[in-house]
Amino acid sequence: MRPLTHEETKTFFEKLAQYIGKNITHLIDRPDDPHCFRLQKDRVYYVSERAMKMATSVARQNLMSLGICFGKFTKTNKFRLHITALDYIAQYARYKIWVKSNGEMPFLYGNHVLKAHVGRITDDTPQHQGVVIYSMNDTPLGFGVTARSTLELRRLEPTAIVAFHQADVGEYLRDEDTLF
């Protein structure tokens, strides 16, 4: 595992800031246990510094993963967030969408969020902003990108797309071979 380069850090933080904004500092500057981001085989891991120091005794080729996988870099050097980062993204998310019970299953099967499925949405959510999708009982289901702003949402027809699907907890089953 190695630290991220300047370009990798910039790309990663830009993607992460789309969902949690300035709360990135809460991920790194934790008073209880300091954490850092490390790269291993194009995947970015969120690791406690204590666990990272212990892992130095493991050979690089033998190390499969360490910490929480936040996502991976594509071959074109773009960053793609994984569903494994949902717990941390949901904890610090700025914008949220709550879907009704009739919209949970379509979202968990990989479909976009429609207006008919929206129960609530955070006020003043801009267009093309990263959002965390919740069930009505505040269980995080996944995350996506808004297709419309909150103001435009009010006058849309029920079949219009509100948020584009990025990742959902159903991926643990659908992509279990390639996820980790």
Curated annotation (Swiss-Prot):
Can you say where in the cell this protein is located?
Cytoplasm; Nucleus, Nucleolus
Task: Locate the coiled-coil region(s) and give their ranges.
Answer: none
**Keyword Transmembrane included in the entry's annotation:** no
Report which superkingdom the organism of origin falls in: Eukaryota
A Gene Ontology annotation in the biological process aspect, one of them, is: assembly of large subunit precursor of preribosome
Q: Which InterPro entries match?
A: NIP7_N, Nip7_N_euk, PUA, PUA-like_sf, PUA_sf, Ribosomal_synth_fac_NIP7, UPF0113_PUA
Picking any one GO molecular function of the record gives:
RNA binding
Q: Where is the PUA domain?
A: 94-170
Q: Quick one: a GO cellular component term?
A: preribosome, large subunit precursor
> What keywords would UniProt list here?
Cytoplasm, Nucleus, Ribosome biogenesis, RNA-binding
User: Record's SUPFAM superfamilies?
Assistant: Pre-PUA domain, PUA domain-like
Q: Does the keyword Nucleus apply?
A: yes
Q: What does this protein do?
A: Required for proper 27S pre-rRNA processing and 60S ribosome subunit assembly.
Q: Tell me, how does this one assemble?
A: Interacts with pre-ribosome complex.
Q: Which family does it belong to?
A: Belongs to the NIP7 family.
Q: What is this protein called?
A: 60S ribosome subunit biogenesis protein nip7
Q: What is the lineage of its organism?
A: Eukaryota, Fungi, Dikarya, Ascomycota, Taphrinomycotina
